């Protein structure tokens, strides 16, 4: 009976394989939830029950070819719409799947899946026993099963989620039609630079290279370029980062990037040679094509590299030239793709034919293997390095694969050049020999300041926050058995100006607020100048230093709602007068280059006002002479009522050079102001009483 049962089961299996059909949404949902749960690492396991899937997204232009299921707590799974193909095409434990802003490489990869699935459906192919078994194991899955979670795997190696768009492309050719006003950096450059950042190698390039592009002749002397990885970040954030833009641009020039505002392209074989010739990577580095390997042989090649801690540059389906990174795997079929699209859609994807009997739509795949540094690596740390950016990353110097050495005594001073708050260290990796090797963190610029933490062992430390704007890190080793540490340092830029500030004085000084530091990116600051009873306002720049054309200081006439003038660059312009008593200064910056900022002075003209126009109703009369004045300035005041009057002489910068108070006078009063020691030029006499205010322009000349 036992043998008969086995035979019947086998026949049923063959029958099922012979009549493979479409998969309905409910079955696909059950498969998606089971698969995600079965592959979920312990770090993502928040509960033993199956995750909750949201409504399916149907993929396919004329018919459903696959389903995409997003999950309430993050992650997504792509499921075949035919059970003649392998059940799961791709998955991620984070993020969501939509059709919005998909990386071009992902779109091309999904097109490859669609071609395969259409071929399988059109030819009515049967599922293999292995494919049928995969579907059955997922439809019958129970949450307590853990076998699939024990699969051979390598967690994603790359800490970065870089991009080829805005800010990453800041040094690429200028083109207003491209992201951030520049052409795309290119997926080839991004895939190269993410692995370069992973190794933090080289510190300096080799040789030089130039070529003629659609944007003129582009040239880089790599031998004069220094790459400062400690001032790069895992993701660029809202501010520009010269170091991150530099490495992408240099990779682009090295491969003769065909720059364009809607997408930049290059050849993968150029990437391989450039990495060896200009960036010093191993002579064993090479571009391999999937078509030259068996399915198993290709998977083994990729896994061998990843097991060694060597991420891969990968190019995908067809002739589109799409490049990205493969940096991990689960099992022998699913490899982790970092698309180079700010982390969007990163996940595990199936590499091979979805049905062995189908046509081959996986052509064009290739990988740069043995992508590891030359023989002069690792560098290890030495001395004390000062870091001037307000955010970045620090690694002990041994790299992601090797251990550090004994006898190290090195440090990092985090001293941002900008005004910052909330300076914080966040650890991503930590492995030191307990009690033998130590990382000390001091709350200030050197080891004489209070010790915030003395770290050793393998437990990942909690975040460490400075009380001020400086941190000093000291790394001391006696052993060589640890793999070291990697951390990010981050801080918040001080707010120099924001919102709207109102100025009601007759004269004053307005600035971007940054003082001796550079202003911030993405600033929008408004300054309303509305002195009481003013009929004109004159603005004079004391200094001006902004990114030309992009970071602008604009002056508006609020009475007419019109733009009077706009300024940028570093040349001091002529004074500008707004012919009304209401003006606004607007400072607006983009997200790229910053500079020293600006300061301007304003002085307003006003008419005398009182309780009534006549002197006998309590008004204040003012006469000023001689004009021009050389040694003395005579101010005649008159009032029928007791008056306290403040008389001030103000220069064009808004600085008060003379103050004179006449208290409680009635009738006539003369104020003599000595001006012989003052420089020649225009000044403003400002006077104010309880019911009367005004200014007179005064010329001092000799």
Q: Over which residues does each language-model region extend?
A:
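Active-site-adjacent structural segments surrounding the nucleophilic cysteine of cysteine proteases
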Residues: 88-89, 94-264, 330
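Short, surface-exposed beta-strand/strand-loop-strand elements in extracellular ectodomains
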Residues: 431-450, 543-563
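C-terminal outer-membrane/trafficking sorting elements
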Residues: 16, 614-625, 629-702
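Extended extracellular/luminal ectodomain segments enriched in beta-structured repeat modules
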Residues: 417-424, 531-538
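Active-site-adjacent substructure of cysteine-protease-like catalytic cores
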Residues: 53-73, 273, 277-338
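Residue-level detector of functionally pivotal "anchor" positions at catalytic/ligand-binding pockets or at interdomain
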Residues: 364-386, 493-502, 506, 510, ...
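Short beta-strand-plus-loop segments that form exposed binding edges in beta-rich domains
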Residues: 473-481, 585-594
């Amino acid at each position: 009976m036992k043998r008969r049962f086995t035979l019947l089961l086998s026949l049923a299996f063959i029958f099922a394989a012979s009549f493979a059909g479409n998969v309905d949404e409910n079955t696909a949902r059950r498969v998606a939830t089971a698969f995600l749960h079965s592959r979920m690492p312990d770090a993502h396991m928040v509960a033993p029950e199956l995750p909750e899937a949201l409504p399916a997204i149907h993929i396919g232009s004329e018919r459903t070819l696959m389903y995409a299921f997003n999950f309430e707590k993050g992650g997504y799974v792509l499921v075949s719409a035919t059970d003649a193909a392998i059940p799961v095409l791709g998955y991620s434990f984070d993020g969501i799947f939509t059709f919005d802003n998909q990386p071009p490489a992902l779109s091309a990869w999904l097109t490859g899946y669609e071609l395969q699935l259409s071929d399988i459906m059109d030819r009515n192919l049967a599922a293999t026993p292995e494919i049928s078994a995969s579907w059955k194991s997922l439809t019958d899955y129970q949450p307590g099963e853990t076998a699939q979670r024990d699969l051979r795997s390598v967690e994603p190696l790359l800490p970065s989620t870089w991009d080829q768009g805005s800010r990453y492309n800041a040094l690429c050719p200028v083109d207003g039609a491209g992201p951030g006003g520049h052409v795309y950096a290119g997926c080839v450059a991004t895939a190269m630079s993410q692995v370069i950042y992973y190794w933090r190698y080289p510190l300096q390039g080799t040789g030089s290279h130039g070529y003629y592009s659609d944007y003129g002749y582009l040239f880089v002397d790599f031998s004069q370029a220094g790459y400062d990885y400690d001032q790069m970040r895992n993701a660029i954030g809202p501010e520009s980062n010269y170091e991150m833009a530099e490495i992408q641009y240099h990779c682009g020039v090295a491969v003769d990037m065909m720059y364009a505002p809607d997408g930049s392209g290059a050849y993968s074989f150029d990437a391989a040679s450039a990495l060896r010739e200009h960036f010093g990577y191993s002579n064993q580095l090479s571009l391999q094509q999937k078509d030259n390997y068996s399915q198993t042989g290709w998977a083994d090649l990729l896994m061998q590299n990843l097991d060694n801690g060597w991420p891969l540059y990968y190019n995908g389906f067809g002739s589109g030239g799409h490049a990205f990174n493969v940096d991990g795997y689960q099992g022998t079929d699913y490899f982790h793709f970092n698309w180079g699209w700010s982390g969007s859609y990163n996940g595990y994807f199936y590499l091979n034919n979805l049905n062995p009997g189908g046509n081959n739509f996986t052509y064009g795949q290739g990988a740069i293997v043995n992508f590891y540094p030359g023989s002069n690596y690792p560098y290890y740390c030495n001395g004390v390095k000062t870091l001037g950016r307000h955010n970045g990353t620090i690694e002990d110097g041994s790299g992601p694969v090797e251990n550090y050495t004994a006898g190290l005594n090195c440090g990092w001073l985090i001293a941002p050049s900008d005004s910052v708050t909330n300076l914080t260290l966040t650890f991503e990796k930590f492995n030191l020999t307990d009690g033998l090797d130590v990382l000390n963190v001091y709350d200030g610029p050197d080891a004489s300041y209070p010790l915030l933490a003395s770290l050793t062992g393998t437990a990942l430390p909690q975040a460490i926050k400075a009380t001020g704007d400086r941190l000093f890190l000291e790394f001391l080793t006696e052993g060589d058995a640890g793999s070291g540490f990697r951390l990010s340092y981050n801080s918040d830029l001080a707010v120099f100006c924001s919102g709207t500030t109102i100025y009601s004085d007759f004269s004053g000084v307005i600035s971007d607020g940054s003082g001796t530091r550079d202003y911030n990116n993405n600033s929008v600051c408004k300054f309303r100048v509305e002195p009481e009873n003013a009929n004109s306002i004159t603005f004079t720049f004391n200094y001006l230093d902004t990114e030309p054309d992009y970071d602008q200081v604009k002056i508006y006439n609020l009475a007419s709602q019109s733009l009077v003038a706009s300024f940028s660059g570093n040349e001091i312009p002529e004074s500008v007068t707004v012919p009304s008593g209401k003006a606004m200064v607007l400072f607006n910056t983009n997200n790229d280059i910053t500079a020293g900022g600006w300061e301007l002075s304003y002085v307003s003209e006003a008419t005398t006002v009182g309780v009534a126009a006549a002197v006998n109703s309590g008004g204040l009369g003012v006469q000023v002479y001689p004009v021009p004045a050389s040694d003395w300035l005579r101010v005649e005041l008159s009032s029928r009522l007791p008056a306290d009057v403040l008389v001030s002489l103000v220069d064009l910068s808004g600085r008060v050079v003379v103050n004179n108070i006449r208290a409680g006078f009635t009738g006539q009063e003369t104020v003599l102001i000595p001006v012989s020691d003052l420089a020649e030029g225009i000044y403003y006499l400002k006077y104010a009483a309880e019911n009367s205010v005004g200014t007179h322009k005064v010329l001092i000349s000799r």
